[in-house]
Amino acid sequence: MISFLSGCLYPEDRLAQNRVPYKDQIAMVQSAVDQFQEAEGGILPLKTKENETPIFQKYLIDFKKLSPRFIAEPPGSAFESGGIFQYVLVDVETDPTVKLIDLTMVDAIRDLKLRIKFFAERNGYPPYKEPLDQEKGYFSLDYDKLGYNNTSPFVVSPYSGKNLSLFIDTKGEILVDYSPDLYDALKKFKHNYKTGDDIRYLLVENYDFVPAFSVPYTVKDNDPIFLKE
């Protein structure tokens, strides 16, 4: 799930300058994407990804196709320029729109995956703790067995700045629990989402970021729950 990144993610001395501002840079990339699509007969400047790639990580913008004709170079906030954002597209069929993946969460996910790998090599299975959804195969993890010493790894939400917990599925993928952000969004924004709808799009519609490394959620009694597909 994080295979599109490798090595050192971003030099520390470039973090501050390449984190903000990003609003103008999103607009610049959106303009370049629109021009490319018009010039290329509807084709989008995308990197090739496997069909099973999670939807919000599937449509990565290929800046090599945009530069230098439509944009001088990738914006400073882009991963390709040493920044901490991966530029992606959503609504590719109807209204291709530029959004961001916050890559600061990748280090925590990668570290957890490595610890699980070493544990599983010794024990034959990950250190599952409790089922979060037995039917979907989502589990919490016993972090003490992974050497976290009474602490739990987390990622910082690009939406709220809250600490978001992590969990695992039966395929070994590490996933981010966006339920706190979804709960807030359901209360904050007017919407027509009902049980059975994927409410992650409420975040996409109202923020510049996509909920990367996530699973589908829906709403029941005004609360976010895992979507039963």
Question: Where do the language-model regions lie?
Answer:
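Bacterial signal peptide processing site
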Residues: 9-12
